[in-house]
Amino acid sequence: VVAVMITSDKAYDNVEWIWGYRETDRLGGKDPYSASKGMAELAIRTFVESYFSHSDSNVRVGITRAGNVIGGGDWAVDRIVPDCMRAWSKSEVVDIRSPMATRPWQHVLEPLSGYLALGAMLASNEQLHGDAYNFGPPAHQNHPVKELIDEMAKYWDHVKWNDVSESEEHLHEAGLLKLNCDKALFDLNWMPTLQFKETIRMTVEWYKRYYQANDSSMYDFTIAQIEEYTRLALSREMNWAIK
């Protein structure tokens, strides 16, 4: 039995240093959301050590922490991409809390490819049992929120947004967050497929199709995006795609 457990880059106790967090760095958080991810990691570790570390256990567990995931189908409130898509589809202004905050943006298909690669390798390699892995973009593809907005705006007309970082009271929000994904590259031979601009293009194209097609053909369009992603991975000789 293989189980891939998924938390988030928010699981790390973020002190906003300039280098990416490694899997051995301290977990925690200064806000309830981040702290909840740290607590999930503790719960996972407890079960691994208590129930699945005996020699006769047939369960292998992998732990994953993904960078900021974007992509079609996300409708959560107070998330930068869905908020922009909803507002811009109605020619409305969207409020941006932290335009200069930097995040490890990645398309949702990127960590999914990592989860599947980890699960497949866990089945044949018991040495990976109980290990944690970061899945995110390379360091040079961490971008501020404003750059994300500017890139998304290229695909919309009449884009409007308002910087409320100085005028709005809100909960603690980190200004800088990076992940170090060297371990996934070394152990799993995994690396992201898409460049930043490709990530934004695929994301915005999904939402534009949704609003234009009134949800009638999103299944087929979503499958087409998965196939496009897989073709790109093959053409770029990503190890998980070749296997």
What is each stretch, according to the model?
Residues W88-K243:
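C-terminal substrate-binding subdomain of Rossmann-fold SDR/epimerase-dehydratase oxidoreductases
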Residues D31, R79, D83, P144, ...:
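Amphipathic alpha-helical recognition patches that constitute DNA-binding helices
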Residues W17-Y21, A76-I80, P111-L112, L148-D150:
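Short, glycine/charged-enriched secondary-structure capping and boundary segments
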